[in-house]
From Swiss-Prot:
Any one Gene Ontology cellular component term annotated for this protein: proteasome complex
Protein name per UniProt: Proteasome-associated protein ECM29 homolog
Primary location recorded for the protein, binned into one broad class: cytoplasm
Phosphoserine PTM sites in chain numbering: 1213, 1683, 1692
Compartment(s): Cytoplasm
Keyword Nucleotide-binding: no
GO MF: molecular adaptor activity
InterPro entries xref list: ARM-like, ARM-type_fold, ARM_ECM29, Ecm29_N, HEAT_ECM29
Regions crossing the membrane: none
UniProt KW keywords: Cytoplasm, Phosphoprotein, Proteasome, Repeat
Length: 1890
């Protein structure tokens, strides 16, 4: 066989011939399919002539195919040929031509099948590849995506072709970037390169086409064909599209995608940087431009999610600056760019960012500032970024103070919206300028030869201080706030200028005072200062180190130590600044005649702080004013005071003096007293000029003020006046005392006491001998004071007691006679003013002792006076021990059972020890050799034994008193032999008191035990400790003897535990000491545990103990591992007493709480886990609270998986599975047990802890935490699912569900295996979590359907928003078919069997979600779900029905055909049973909404039902339902065409309904027929019309029923298009006539109306019959009940008024319809009938008109109009018939002969009709006048037809109209005026012949 070129050419010729002979598309298609690929293959021929011939053939084929668009081309074979390895370029050229021509002609399924081949063709020529890619773009929106996920990923089969995949995705991205409406002539759009723009603009899409392509691309990207990483960037671009249809699905998919992407992976974020700024390619054609602002906005939103390695500093910098200053940007972009910059500064690689940090700072500063034009939100973001910059790179900020200055200025002048962000920026900058940040060699360089408090600042610091000085007194609060932050952060706390400015702010701004006070004093309230935490720089020696600054900035503000500045430095600075202010006269305040440099508030702040500095510089570490340390202050003043202007103490005295001169206050008076009390000889004489203002203040209403003034006044008199002057002033004061007011007398009495106390002390100090008994002024003062003790005013008694205390302590009181006033014993009147007094003579000592002791005993005396009286007795024993010591001790023992009051007992204890010691124990022993000779060792021993014996007294009053007294005696008399000898006895006594019911007595006893232990030597301490532990743990308390006055329980102590027993701190402490095998530690613990409020007050100051010694702390160190966990648990004990005590111990033992807790974290957690289920409820609560606090770490949960080496579990740990975090799982397990506790408080605490733990677990399991997150999730998720979600306790279920819900976002993939259990549990829980109140309201509203449905709708929305449903929504994306199949039985059971509304709603909603998620994949299960939902739409609750209807709508598109048919059948059956069931319509509506095409396929089933249902009789109940059916009809089959096209299925439905036994269904079918007749009118086919008429005629037979009139109305509607000559017409009229004769009035009314319509349409002559059957109705006066019931009332007298009105209205309506029917039945073509009735009708109408009601009159005139319109006699050609030949004309009931001629008849009719018109004209009724004018118009129209006829009727009309015109014109209605105008126009045109 020949194989050369000729043979090939011959073959090609044959092919050409075959193609030429193909004379049809089918033949051409067959030829092309057979020969095209072999012909193209010939392109590989080596012979040129062959190739030429091939081109000829191919050109012919191309030309033929171009004109025949339906001819298919063998695309698949061409693709295989194109992809073959040996294909030449020529071959590929032609193959690509035919591929691009043939691919669009293929069916969609074929295109989908070939997609992988089209995309996968590897070719070096990009243009060819682009052409192939372009073939797929238009079909992506319609391409069928496989349901199987594995098949989806293989749809394009690009797994092994990464280059092609990347190229295809790049093309998709370029298309998404292409703007709408762009043309080739325009520039390259943002985001594209010239090459990419060229290749996609060639497609020349219109905007709508491009939108469709983009929608297809997004749909394809969301179909899981590519990996998440590959589709991420294209979807971000799509989400920025301007068309809603493109952006919305992209945004939805991105929200799912972002939970799965790892934003710490550079591969995720690198394309974002590139797209944002362009690819910077070196090839110009491939260089992409930066993208547009919309896309940038989206890119930045995802760049902000970058973490770790994905933060690219170089590109990030380019992105941010392009976002700030680039061209393609907007406001939102700038904000996001700044947020990204903040991320860059915070989380970027520090070493790289630090290199460009100054550049970043410059960029930020350009955006903000006073001159910035940027919007507020941009500036806010810039300030936030600046704040982060300052935190990350403080060195950049610290080099430019102008920045801070500028922002301070901005803060003062900017809009309020910027305040918070500028403040944040400034506050972040403050640490950059902090003194502590300088190098120690520079910043802390202090000249050791100079004062240690001097601070060396650099120039920056000085400039900053100057700026802060300007801003400290700013009028803008936030400026002062920021200033205070700088002052507290940038300077050492002992730096005086900074403290000075802070004090200015505290005084001026109330809102900042608390904060500033915290920095200055270590606490927010001045009366809460912990003075042990304060120290002065003067006594810190070399403590000027960074440590103090660190404490200042980092420790808890309430616990940190405070370093006070040197008093001299501080005072010098204050003095300097005050002098400057006074000279400048700025900000000065004038008070009285004194000019102050500061306001009174600022002055007070300065004085308080200066006073504190003074005392601490003097070496005192205690509250200022403490008498024990006055000598130290005296030494300091004596050493440093000089009477020169530059002396700090002199300046202080002047500063205080100026304040006192201006206005006396507590602060300045106490400051003055400090100076005078410490060094009176230095200051008293210089302050005498203050006596006058101070004397005026003695009248002040404030008692405190008078007391403060009196002590100052007393010192000034004693030390400032000479002896003679002193005696003179005192004498004058005493003489004038009786004439002064009460307050004035009180003040002067105190002055006398203070001045004698000071004067006597001064005399003794100077060793001057003076006989005090012979000092007249002194003796006189004692007498007056003694008399005042007996006064009735408590104020004077209080002053007298204080005076006796002051004088009695200083000297023996002279025993002189005195006359006092006492109340008469026989006085019965209780009124003090009416009490009679008797004078008696006595001595001063007798009076004083008796009265003071009586005040102490008296329960009616004021508390303060009783305490002062107790102390007074002790002071008397100091001054006169011989007289008072023995008496005091005897009397005190009688006071044990007085009122139980801690403060009073402490006061008595002070008096006892003062009496025993012979000196004021608060001031200390006068000298070491001092011995109280009035109380020797025997007396002391006897008194001590008496106290110990009273310990066993069961009286609670006595036990409290003895405990306090015994403690005081042991503390202050510890060196007495009796105390040392009775240590063990004292321990037993205190141990006995330790078991008392009173917490206070327990505290006192524990302090006593500690004291006894501390005064013992080391040998006996061990014995005491073992003995104590034995008593506390093993011993038993002796039973108290109960007497009649015994108080069994202290107030507030009963019922503190479930058993009624008393809880003590010491039980826990003993247990701890015993476990440690260190009995002596109990003393340390007890010592630390006491913190009773009474002890922390000034009253208990005498019993305060030192903190833990260094030796004891060192001893505890080895045991901290056991002590710390136990103490940590004890801290949270719910018993306040124990909790506070343990916190006290903790604070003392633990120096840094955070560090210690972190060190012993696992030990503490083990302690808490072991005790979480302890048998005592308070321990369980404590553990719950402690766990919550332990877990609350700044860094989140502490995990085992994060530790370098896993630690072995302790032996006593719970048996748990091998999980990464065993403690975490055990903690959940234990908490669940406690949440099911019997004790409510325990359950509440456990619930709070579990909720908090859930939040921590959610954070810890986040994907951001990598492996540790996985460890947390895998440890707890299975447990929560297995145990928590299905737990019987609702709270446990809620916590579990909430935790799982929140965890799904972060660790969702781990949840998948448990979904079959989880989903049903969540659905069940949805119902249980429902608000019971809403459920109750719904039940109560059962009678009101609308209200109940509204409430149930709220319940449903609430159920959908519960976290259970949110969790289900998150879980859905992890459900596949196998999981759904497993859970289906339980879900279906819930749908059918649950009674909770929430569960039912949740199930329906879940069905909707899962149908969207799985689609066709769930088809096998859809039938089951549809059956369950069908049960739901029959539910009694409307809301449940609605949601199940929606669920069916979702499911039906996925169902099998059999299920669909079955559902539609059931819906029809359900409608037949429950026509009012709204859910049927809702179901069909839902199906139509989601699967419109499906409903079209089953239109024959549903359309008749919809059409029939929409014609239900509407009433209040069914109105909404009918509207819903109508809306559904309009959606499904709008317009008349829908009815016409579906009549073949609608009529059978109506036929069956009309033959139904139900009357309502008959009426409903009639309504539907009426609609058909009305809408289709003449277009209704005659067979269908006749079929319907016959149906109605059949239905009309039989008795009357409710709704039967609808059949007549439908029949009337059908007659409108009926042939009038059809034989059925007579049947129709006969049926209507028959129904019109029925007697029931209402039905007869409607039947007559329908009859009128029928006769009018058919133009039949039945007037006579109609007239005969209805005329009698017009003559009726009242309507009688047509009934056979004899009991029915018939006469109007027997009826009620309402019934009579109702009958009258019915009769009137009947008459109206009769006239309408008569008018319509007036024959149009029957001349004989007209002539027989024409005169009669006109005359009778006129006669009846006047007697009728208005509506009837209107109907009558309307009938007359129709009568005139159809009257044949008005025609010019009309002939009067010979009535003799036919029936005689109807006789008129008058004597006149009837007119014979036409003219006479016309004239007669006109006369009668115009009479009716005239009557109507006079009636004030617009409707009546309108009809009358219509008659006139009709008469003119009919009679003006011929110009040559009789003009008489027209003249009559004109005369009648003109005569009645005025009456017509009275009505101003527009229609009346319009008709009058028409009539006038017509009459004016007529020219009647005369």
């Amino acid at each position: 066989m020949e194989t050369g070129p000729n043979a090939e050419i011959e073959l090609l010729e044959r092919v050409l011939l075959r193609l030429g002979n193909a004379d049809s598309d089918e033949k051409l298609e067959a030829a092309v399919g057979k020969f095209l690929t072999p012909v193209i293959l010939k392109m590989n021929s080596p012979h040129n002539v062959v190739r030429t011939k091939v081109v000829e053939v191919l050109t012919h084929i191309k030309r033929r195919l171009s004109s025949r668009g339906h001819v298919q081309i063998p695309v698949e074979a061409l693709l295989d040929q194109y992809a073959a390895q040996d294909s030449s370029t020529f071959l590929k050229n032609f193959a690509i031509i035919f591929i691009t021509m043939g691919f669009p002609r293929l069916a969609l399924e074929q295109q989908t099948a070939l997609a992988s081949k089209v995309v996968g063709c590897e070719d070096k020529l990009e243009s060819y590849q682009d052409k192939l890619f372009a073939l797929l773009l238009p079909v992506l929106s319609d391409m069928k995506i496989p349901d199987d996920p594995t098949q989806r990923s293989k749809l394009l089969d690009l797994q092994d072709k990464p280059a092609i995949c990347a190229n295809f995705l790049a093309l998709l991205q370029d298309v998404l970037l292409l703007p709408y409406g762009i043309t080739q002539e325009q520039d390259v759009p943002p985001g594209l390169s010239p090459y990419s723009f060229t290749r996609i603009i060639a497609y020349n899409w219109r905007a709508e086409e491009l939108e469709k392509v983009k929608k297809g691309i997004v749909r394809f990207l969301c179909a899981s064909v590519f990996s998440d990483l590959q589709i991420f960037v294209p979807l971000v671009v799509a989400s920025a599209d301007t068309r809603f249809s493109v952006a919305t699905p992209a945004i939805t998919e991105l929200s799912k995608l972002c939970t799965m992407l790892d934003f710490s992976n550079p591969a995720v974020t690198a394309p974002l940087y590139t797209l944002f700024a362009g690819n910077q390619s070196k090839i110009t054609d491939r260089q992409t431009r930066p993208c547009c602002a919309r896309v940038r906005q989206k890119l930045l939103q995802y760049l902000i999610k970058c973490r770790g390695k994905s933060i690219n500093v170089t590109k990030g910098l380019q992105v941010t600056f392009d976002g700030f200053f680039g061209t393609n940007t907007n406001q939102k972009c700038k904000v996001l760019a700044l947020q990204f910059m903040e991320l860059l500064l915070r989380d970027g690689p520090r070493e790289l960012v630090s290199k460009v940090s100054k550049v970043i700072l410059t960029g930020i500063t350009k955006i903000i500032g006073r001159d910035s034009n940027e919007p507020n939100d941009v500036q806010n973001a810039a300030y936030s970024a600046l704040a982060q910059h300052a935190r990350s790179f403080p060195q950049d900020v610290s080099q430019d103070l102008k920045l801070v200055l500028g922002y301070f200025n901005n803060l003062a002048s900017c809009a309020p919206e910027l305040h918070s962000s500028i403040r944040e920026a400034l506050v972040s900058m403050a640490p950059a300028f902090a003194w502590k940040t300088k190098e120690k060699s520079d910043a802390m360089e202090v000249d050791k030869n100079v004062d240690s408090s001097s601070v060396k600042l650099d120039g920056q610091q000085h400039l900053l201080l100057a700026m802060l000085l300007d801003n400290a007194e700013s009028k803008v609060q936030i400026v002062q706030n920021v200033t205070s932050v700088f002052l507290t952060s940038c300077y050492p706390e002992y730096y005086a200028p900074a403290r000075y400015l802070l004090l200015l702010i505290a005084g001026e701004r109330n809102s900042l005072r608390e904060n500033v006070t915290t920095y200055l004093y270590g606490t927010s309230k001045k009366d809460h200062i912990n003075y042990s935490m304060l120290s002065s720089i003067d006594h810190s020696k070399n403590r000027i180190s960074s440590e103090s600054i660190s404490d200042f900035n980092h420790l808890s503000l309430e616990q940190r130590r405070v370093m006070l500045p040197s008093f001299q430095v501080m005072m010098s600075h204050v003095h300097e600044m005050a002098e400057k202010r006074l000279k400048k006269n700025t900000a000065c305040v004038v008070v009285g005649r004194t000019k102050l440099p500061y306001s009174l508030e600022v002055y007070e702040e300065l004085l308080d702080y200066l006073r504190l500095c003074l005392w601490y510089s003097a070496g005192v570490v205690a509250a200022p004013g403490d008498e024990k340390y006055t000598h130290e202050l005296r030494e300091y003043i004596t050493l440093h005071y000089e009477d020169t202007e530059d002396n700090a103490l002199h300046q202080y005295a002047q500063f205080v003096q100026r304040s006192v001169e201006a206005k006396r206050s507590e602060s300045n008076l106490i400051c003055l007293y400090d100076l005078l009390n410490a060094a009176p000889e230095l200051f008293a004489a210089k302050q005498l000029h203050l006596l006058e203002p101070l004397g005026n203040t003695l009248k002040d209403v404030s008692e405190t003020m008078r007391i403060n003034v009196a002590q100052v006044y007393g010192i000034l008199w004693a030390f400032g006046l000479s002896d003679e002057k002193f005696d003179e002033e005192v004498g004058e004061c005493l003489n004038s005392l009786t004439q002064k007011t009460l307050e004035h007398k009180h003040g002067w009495l105190l002055v006398v006491g203070h001045t004698f106390n000071r004067k006597i002390a001064m005399l003794k100090q100077e060793n001057k001998t003076k006989d005090f008994a012979a000092w007249p002024q002194f003796v006189n003062a004692v007498k007056i004071i003694s008399k005042c003790l007996c006064e009735s005013q408590w104020l004077l008694v209080s002053a007298a007691v204080k005076c006796i205390s002051m004088i009695g302590k200083a000297v023996e009181i002279p025993n002189v006679p005195v006359e006092i006033q006492v109340p008469s014993k026989d006085g019965d009147d209780d009124d003090e003013e009416m009490t009679e007094y008797t004078s008696i003579d006595s001595s001063t000592k007798l009076v004083i002792f008796g009265v003071v002791f009586q005040l102490l005993r008296s329960s009616s005396a004021r508390q303060k006076i009783r305490e002062d009286s107790a102390r007074c007795l002790g002071y008397l024993a100091i001054g006169d021990g011989e007289h008072f010591t023995k008496r005091n001790l005897d009397k005190f023992l009688t006071l044990t059972k007085i009122q139980k009051d801690a403060a009073l007992n402490i006061a008595i204890s002070e008096a006892i020890v003062n009496t025993l010691c012979g000196y004021d124990v608060n001031k200390g022993q006068p000298d070491e050799k001092f011995v109280n000779k009035h109380c020797n060792d025997d007396d002391f021993d006897q008194f001590l034994n008496s106290l110990i014996r009273l310990v066993t007294d069961p009286n609670p009053h006595s036990r409290q008193a003895i405990s306090v007294w015994l403690l005081a005696v042991v503390k202050h008399c510890s060196q007495r032999p009796a105390v040392l000898a009775k240590k063990e006895l004292l321990q037993f006594a205190f141990t006995e008191l330790l078991s008392d019911d009173s917490e206070f007595v327990q505290d006192v006893a524990s302090r006593g035990l500690g004291l006894v232990y501390s005064i013992s030597d080391s040998g006996s301490q061990s014995d005491l400790a073992n003995s104590l532990l034995d008593q506390l743990i093993g011993g038993k308390r002796k039973v108290n003897q109960v007497t009649a006055d015994t108080e069994l329980f202290a107030e507030g102590m009963l019922g503190k535990t479930p058993t009624g027993g008393n809880i003590t701190t010491y039980k826990e402490l003993c247990s701890l000491a015993s476990d440690l095998n260190q009995p002596d530690m109990i003393y340390q613990f007890m010592q630390l545990a006491n913190h009773n409020a009474t002890w922390t007050s000034k009253l208990g100051a005498a019993f305060g103990l030192k903190t833990l010694s260094a030796e004891s702390r060192q001893k505890m160190e080895p045991y901290l591992g056991k002590i710390i966990p136990r103490l940590y648990r004890y801290k949270y004990d719910p018993t306040p007493k124990i909790q506070n005590s343990m916190i006290s111990i903790w604070d003392t033992i633990v120096t840094d709480s955070k560090e210690v807790t972190e060190r012993y974290y696992w030990e503490i957690l083990r302690e808490l886990l072991d005790n979480l289920t302890c048998k005592e409820w308070r321990v369980r609560i404590a553990c719950c609270l402690a766990v919550r606090d332990l877990l609350n770490r700044p860094n989140g949960l502490k995990l085992r998986s994060e530790e370098p080496v896993r630690r072995a579990l302790p032996d006593n740990s719970m048996e748990v599975d091998e999980v990464p975090e065993p403690e975490l799982k055990e903690l959940w397990f234990q908490l669940f047990r406690v949440m099911d506790d019997i004790h409510e408080g325990t359950r509440v605490a456990a619930h709070g802890t579990a909720s908090f733990l859930g939040k921590l677990c959610v954070i810890a399991s986040s994907s951001d935490h990598g492996k540790s997150g996985t460890a947390v999730a895998s440890s707890i998720l299975p447990f929560l699912l297995e145990t928590g979600v299905g737990h019987k306790v609702p709270e446990i279920r809620r916590v579990s569900i909430k935790t799982i819900s929140d965890m799904i976002d972060s660790s969702g993939s781990l949840i998948a295996p448990h979904l079959a259990t989880l989903i049903p549990c969540l659905l069940r829980a949805t119902g249980e979590l429902e608000n019971t109140k809403l459920s109750y309201v719904s039940t109560r509203l059962g009678a009101d359907n609308e209200a109940q449905e509204a409430v149930d709708t709220l319940r449903a929305e609430a159920a959908k928003s519960l976290h259970t449903m949110e969790t289900i929504g998150k879980c859905v994306r992890y459900i596949d078919y196998s999981v759904l199949e497993k859970m289906t039985p339980e879900v279906l059971e819930l749908m059918k069997g649950s009674v909770n509304l929430g569960t039912k709603i949740g199930c329906a909603h879940f069905v909707c979600l899962i149908s969207i998620r799985l689609g066709k994949e769930m088809t096998p299960l859809v039938g089951k779900y549809i059956r369950a939902c069908f049960v739901g739409i029959k539910n009694r609750n409307a809301t449940v029905r609605k949601y199940n209807a929606s669920a069916i709508g979702h499911l039906l598109g996925l169902a099998k055909e059999q299920s669909i048919k079955s559902l539609f059948t059931k819906l029809e059956e359900l409608y037949a049973e429950q026509p009012g069931n709204r859910s049927i319509a809702l179901t069909i509506q839902s199906i139509n909404k989601r699967h419109h095409e499906l409903l079209k396929d089953y239109m024959d089933s549903m359309l008749p039902l919809i059409f029939f249902a929409m014609h239900e009789e509407p009433n209040e109940e069914t109105k909404a339902n009918v509207e819903l059916w109508k809306d559904l009809w309009h959606d499904v089959s709008p317009g008349d065409a829908g009815i016409r096209l579906n009549l073949n299925v609608i009529i059978p439905k109506l036929e069956s309904s009309l033959t139904d036994a139900s009357w309502s269904r008959k009426a409903q079918a009639a309504n539907a027929i009426q609609t058909i007749a009305t809408r289709l009118s003449s277009s209704l086919d005659e067979p269908d019309r006749l079929r319907l008429i016959k149906l109605l005629l059949s239905g009309l037979q039989g008795r009357t029923f409710e709704g039967k009139e609808r059949l007549l109305q439908a029949l009337a509607a059908l007659t409108k298009g009926l042939d009038r000559n059809h034989q059925i017409c007579s049947s129709i009229i006969d049926a209507a006539m028959r129904e019109a004769r029925k007697r029931e009035p209402v039905y007869r009314t409607m039947a007559l109306a329908s009859l009128g319509e029928i006769l009018d349409q058919l133009e039949a002559d039945r007037f006579e019959e109609v007239y005969n059957m209805s005329w009698n109705l017009l003559e009726k006066k009242e309507l009688r009940k047509e009934s056979d019931d004899e009991d029915e009332p018939n006469t109007s007298q027997e009826l009620s008024a309402d019934e009579r009105n109702k009958r009258a209205q019915t009769l009137n309506r009947l008459k109206e319809v009769v006239w309408e029917t008569l008018g319509k039945s007036w024959p149009r073509h029957s001349i004989e009938t007209q002539h027989r009735y024409q005169l009669f009708f006109a005359e009778n109408c006129t006669s009846i008109l006047a007697e009728s009601t208005r509506p009837v009159q209107v109907s009558l005139l309307a009938a007359l109009t129709k009568y005139i319109e159809r009257l044949h006699v008005f025609d010019e050609s009309a002939q009067v018939p010979d009535l003799t030949q036919i029936n005689q004309e109807k006789k008129i009931k008058t004597e006149e002969t009837a007119p014979k001629t036409r003219e006479a008849i016309v004239e007669k009719i006109c006369t009668d009709v115009l009479a009716a018109v005239a009557l109507a004209a006079g009636v004030p009724h617009s409707g009546l006048k309108k009809e009358a004018l219509n008659i006139v118009l009709m008469l003119i129209k009919r009679l003006s037809g011929s110009g040559n006829g009789n003009q008489q009727p027209l003249r009559l009309i004109k005369q009648s109209f003109e005569s009645n015109l005025e009456k017509f014109q009275r009505d101003s209605a527009p229609e009346i005026r319009c008709r009058i105008k028409d009539i006038e126009d017509k009459l004016s045109k007529l020219n009647p012949q005369n």
